[in-house]
Amino acid sequence: GGLNLAIEIAKSLLKNDSSFQGDIYDHPDLHFSFPSFASIKDDENVYSEWLSFLKENTFGDYQKWSSYIGNTVSQGSIKVSEIEKVQKKSSLKSYLGGNKVFIFWGAETMMPQTSNKLLKILEEPPVNTYFILITSNIQAILPTIISRCQISNLSPINKKVRETLAKRST
């Protein structure tokens, strides 16, 4: 449910962009970072696959994402190169002139050097820029990152409720 909550928060933060009428996943000021796999290359195609995964899997998890993208061998992680892209995008003016939202799904997969690079952004975030980190293992997040975040703990949604909600969203 963490990703669903993050998307709802993003909708709220981006709602003043009345010029945008499309699907929230296609909003030009909403950016996702997620674990990538060494066995899967093409970055641009992977982002499109990620958006398709989100639309098809309301309550997708790490294993479903790994399987969806066709990974069979490597452990996924959010890479330093991804944080470098976030640094660049976050330093630019928002596309529609309002807020920018960056959602990090699977934040626990960041290696220490990746976390340290993200920490630099979190220490002095650009104006009107919001970062939402989602993790299933908060102990895997650097304490210095945690200290810069507002924490919301969510209990797992039981399978029956998850299935009902997934049916309603399609």
Where are these regions (language model features)?
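Conserved adenine-binding aromatic site and its adjacent loop/helix in ATP-hydrolyzing domains
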Residues: K88, K120, S147
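Loop/turn-to-beta-strand initiation segments
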Residues: L96-V101, P126-I132
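Charged, glycine-rich active-site and insertion segments that engage polyanionic ligands
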Residues: G1-I24, V127-Y130, T135-T170
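Residues immediately C-terminal
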Residues: T109, E124, A140
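Conserved catalytic/switch belt of AAA+ P-loop NTPases
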Residues: S91, N116-Y130
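Generic recognition of short, well-ordered alpha-helical segments
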Residues: Q113-K117, T144
